[in-house]
Amino acid sequence: TNNLNQYLLDKIDPKLNDYESIICNPINVSGAKKIKMIKRGWRNLIKDPLILFNKQKETVAFHFDMHHGHNNLNKAASLLEKKDKNDFIYYINNHNFYNPHIMCIARPEILEKWFNSLFSWLKKCEEVFGFDNLKGYDTLRLYAYLAERYLSYWFKKYTKYKEQPWVSLNL
C-alpha cells in the first residue's frame, strides 16, 4: 500500500483511557519439542526431569535457559533491586508466558519509572556479563532478551495494564 500512515496508531482509543499502559499480547513458551528440551535444556532436566511431562514447568526461566544461556536470567534477576528481586524470580519460575517485543504505550511519568528501573538493572547486568563473550543468537542480544522478560513483570506489577495485539491489519 502507498500510505503507511493508515496502518499506524496515531491516537489512543478512548476506551483505553482507564489503563495506565498497553503491552503486547503474551506468548506462551511451553510446548517445546522433547528433543529440543533434551538438547538445549539438559541441565534443567537433570534438576527436574518432570519438565519433560508437565508443560507448566516449561517456565519463562526454563525457556530462557534453553535459548539464551543457562542460568543467565536467574543470574541477572539476582541483581535487581530488593523491591523487585523476589517477585521477578517468582514470575520467571512460575509463569510460562511473557509479553514480547519490548513494546508498550504509557504516559511519560510511567515510562520514566520503567526506563529508570530497567536501565539501572541492565547496567548492573553489564558489569556481570559484559559484551565480549556475547556471541551468536543465544547471547548477542542478551540485554534485549532480559528487557523483554522484565517488561512483562514490571508493567503488570506497577501499572493498570491492557494487553493488545502488537499489529492488527485488515488488508
Residue ranges and their predicted role:
Residues 1-171:
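ER/Golgi luminal nucleotide-sugar-dependent glycosyltransferases, focusing on the catalytic module
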